[in-house]
């Protein structure tokens, strides 16, 4: 099993649907990978419809690991101060091939790509620009000559 760092570059959003009657939204993104959730900052400019984050979110990722769901669930939320946050929509980013390539080559990258955001009715509510990379961590364990705590020496 290989261990590495999965990094998501959350760049921007475009045409996000308003969830408030007042027309302004304060969008942020929650990204879940294998039960671990990371949150972006809240974008405040442009009334929230075309936000820019430029955030980097990271996970420790094992491949192959437990379970078969090698995907990122990306949820766009509207931050509300006096009530619970509103769900705007979500997208799924599949990363299995990225992890496979990263394990094979040491590093792999999905260049920034547009992902459609859909709401609970599967209606289009905007898009996100997201890049993803995976970098294998160096093996800090055996050096090839150590076994069970003993290091073999050569006898002449």
From Swiss-Prot:
- Ligand binding (Ca(2+) 3): 80, 83, 86
**Top-rank lineage group of the source organism:** Eukaryota
Q: How is the cofactor bound?
A: Binds 3 Ca(2+) ions per C2 domain.
Q: Name its GO BP terms in alphabetical order.
A: defense response
What PROSITE patterns does its record include?
C2
User: What InterPro entries does the annotation carry?
Assistant: C2_dom, C2_domain_sf
* Alphabetical UniProt keywords: Calcium, Metal-binding, Plant defense, RNA-binding, Transport
Residues that hold Ca(2+) 1 according to the record: 20, 26, 78, 80
Specify which residues bind Ca(2+) 2 according to the UniProt entry for this protein: 20, 78, 80, 86
One family name in Pfam for this protein: C2
Which part of the chain is the C2 domain? Answer: 1-108
Gene induction: Regulated by ARR2.
- Required cofactor names: Ca(2+)
Molecular functions (GO terms): metal ion binding; RNA binding
Q: What functional role does this protein have?
A: Binds to both sense and antisense RNA. Can also bind sheared DNA and dodecamer DNA with a low affinity. Interacts with mesophyll plasmodesmata to mediate its own cell-to-cell transport and potentiate RNA trafficking. May play a role in plant defense signaling.
- Name listed for the protein in its UniProt record: 16 kDa phloem protein 1
């Amino acid at each position: 099993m290989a261990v590495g760092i999965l990094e998501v570059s959350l760049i921007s959003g475009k045409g996000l649907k308003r969830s408030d009657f007042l027309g302004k939204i304060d969008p942020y993104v929650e990204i879940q990978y294998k039960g671990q959730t990371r949150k972006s900052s809240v974008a405040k400019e442009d009334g929230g419809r075309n936000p820019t984050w430029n955030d980097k979110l990271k996970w420790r990722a094992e491949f192959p690991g437990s379970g078969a769901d090698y995907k990122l669930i990306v949820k766009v939320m509207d931050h509300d101060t006096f009530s619970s946050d509103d769900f705007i929509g979500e997208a799924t980013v599949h990363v299995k091939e990225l992890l496979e390539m990263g394990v094979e080559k040491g590093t792999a990258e999905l260049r920034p790509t547009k992902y459609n955001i859909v709401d609970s009715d599967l209606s289009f509510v905007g898009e996100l620009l997201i890049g993803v990379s995976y970098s294998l961590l160096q093996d800090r364990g055996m050096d090839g000559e150590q076994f069970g705590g003993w290091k073999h020496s050569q006898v002449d």
